[in-house]
Amino acid sequence: RNKGVVEKFVEFYGPGLHQLPLPDRATIANMCPEYGATVGMFPIDDITLAYMRSTGRDPAQVDLTETYAKAQGLFHTENTPEPDYSDTLELDMTTVEASLAGPRRPQDRIALAEMGRSFHSAMNTVYDKPVTGSHGGAHIEMDGQDVQLDHGSIVIAAITSCTNTSNP
């Protein structure tokens, strides 16, 4: 968003492309509303075709995809010259770290390594509640045992995107 990609078509390219599995590419492309773009896309390449094969696509469809992309100059290899874009943004993929959104807004990113500390801090400062022993906990029976659920108990993971369900 800081780059100003709102209403833009964003294509990902570069030397790190071949290190990124297709499910990760799909997740990044599907998140374009979060980074403000109209669309996020990756070029068709061997990883795309391998994914199509591994997910049971008709071999004729895979061949057609490859043939068409190559005929149109859309098939990407490591030797493909860098396209001429109107603007670019460089991202060092070694700086990307796993993170979570919250506690209240998706843009409030929390590094996964900091999640435990951040959770305890948010419970105390944002919600004014202790993590354990606070009103609102619940007792449930699980596998024949009584279990206490408190704030912070992990009971379900919510996945909010159809693409992310295939790449949790």
Write out the residue ranges for each language-model feature.
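Fe-S-dependent hydro-lyases/dehydratases of central metabolism
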Residues: 1-168
